[in-house]
Amino acid sequence: MADLDLAAIYLAVRDRMCAAIAAMPVADAETIVPACPDWTVHDLLAHQTSMPAALIAGDLPTGVINEWIQGLVDARRDTSIDDLLAEWRSDDAALGGLVANVGILVGDLVAHEGDLCGALGAVADRTAPESEAMLPGALAGLQGPITEAGLGAIEVRHGDRSWRTHDAEPGWSFEADPWEAFRALTSRRTADELRAAAHTGDVEPYLAVLDAHLPLPTASLGER
C-alpha cells in the first residue's frame, strides 16, 4: 500500500458515508446493518467515528480487540447522529495522518461503506476505485492463515487482470470484479455464494480459512 494515498481514499469514502447518513430519514438510524447484524446504522457510524478518535487520543486496545471496539460503540450509544457526524469530520489533518499509517482502518471503512449501502437499500457504486485499491491488502491479510493451513494462494481474476494473496501457485482462483472480490474476501458472501462463483480449484478448505478469519454470513446479504 506504500504507493496509495490512504488518507485521500479514507476521506473520500468518509465524505460519501457522511452524505448518505445525513440525507437518510431519522428512523433509519435504528435500521439493522445486514452485514453486521449486531449493529444498527447508528452503531456503524459510532464505530467509524470512535475508533480513529480513540487511536488519535492514544486509547489503544489492550485486550480482546472486538471487546474494545464494542466498548467504543457502546460509549456513544446516546450520541446523536449529527454529533457523530460532526466528530468524524472535526479534524481531517489528524485523521489523515492516522490512516496514512494504518491501512487496516481504510480497508475497514471501505468494507463498511458497502455495509451501509446494504442497510439503507442503496445501490453501491461497483466502479468506485477504493475497493480495487484495498483488494491487495485484503488478499495479503489472508496469506498467513492460508500458509498455516498448507494451502496455495487465493487468486482473483477479472478480465486480463489478476491479484494473489502471495507469490505462490493458486489453490483457489475465482472470477470477480474488484468490488465483488473485496466483498467476498471480507466475509460478505455466504459459503454457498462463494461455491457458486466461477472458479478453479477446491474452494472448501478456503471457506474454512475465511470463516475462521472473519465468520461468513449464514444468509445472503442480497447484494447481487
Enumerate the language-model features and the residues they cover:
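Amphipathic, well-ordered alpha-helical segments in soluble domains
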Residues: 13-20, 51, 87, 91, ...
